[in-house]
A protein has these predicted regions:
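Conserved catalytic core of two-metal-ion nucleotidyltransferases
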Residues: 2-62, 81-90, 98-177, 183-213
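A short secondary-structure junction signal
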Residues: 64-69
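Short, His- and charge-rich active-site/binding loops that engage polyanionic ligands
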Residues: 71-74
């Protein structure tokens, strides 16, 4: 409700719903005056500007059985919300996902993903002993971060301004990325996200006809 009232029209908030699926698991905010066309979205009619990912954090239940349930629901959510076949997580997951999506009509996919979302996010502070990421893929889904890392924030300089970061940023980054202050070897310094076209000076509208949509 707040976005249409207060946001700059230059930016587009994208979130999948019953009638629109952008193949992400989370909200993205896109700059309509730039271009960053992802391979998995090239056939979609949406603003293909540079995206800022808004990744949610959820509580990590302390009960091991509940944690296993949470992960199962998160995997179900991932499949039916993105509605794409995962290509990088093994043949079993790839073909199992393809079969499940093929057997499930689109209206039912939405109902399944909303049920899964409700179940995986139902845990609160009292029944949890950590924080996790359920919308960043199976790898990050395994991570457990200290609750205290996100109980406050601090402001640090960033490109001429100051931005808030979690007070426990070091614990988070170390868990997620290892020795994050040391650059990886040269052969590992490659992008992890593909783009068909990337242009920070021109709007995606100038590239109409050069990609799938």
């Amino acid at each position: 409700e707040l976005w249409p009232r207060y946001a700059d029209e230059r930016y587009f908030l994208s979130k999948s719903n019953k009638d629109f699926v952008d193949r992400n698991l989370f909200i993205t905010i896109r700059d309509k005056e730039t271009t960053c066309i992802k391979p998995y979205q090239k056939d979609l009619d949406l603003p293909h500007g540079l995206a800022l990912d808004v990744l949610p954090l959820d509580y990590y239940p302390k009960n091991p059985a509940e944690r296993k349930k949470q992960v199962r629901w998160a995997l179900i959510y991932s499949l039916f919300c993105a509605q794409t076949v995962p290509e990088k997580h093994g043949a079993i997951m790839k073909w199992g996902s393809r079969i499940l999506l093929g057997l499930t009509p689109k209206p039912l996919r939405y109902r399944i993903w909303k049920k899964a979302e409700k179940e995986m996010t139902k845990y609160g502070l009292a029944e949890s002993d950590g924080i996790t990421e359920l919308c960043s893929g199976p790898g990050y889904m395994r991570n457990k971060y200290p609750i205290a890392s996100f109980e406050d924030n601090l402001f640090l300089p960033f490109e001429g301004t100051e931005m808030p970061i979690p007070v426990g940023y070091d614990a988070y980054l170390s868990t997620a990325f290892g020795v994050y202050m040391t650059p990886p070897p040269a052969d590992k310094q490659v992008p992890h996200h593909d783009a068909i076209i990337a242009d920070m000076d021109k709007s995606y509208t100038e590239y109409k006809g050069e990609y799938g949509a």
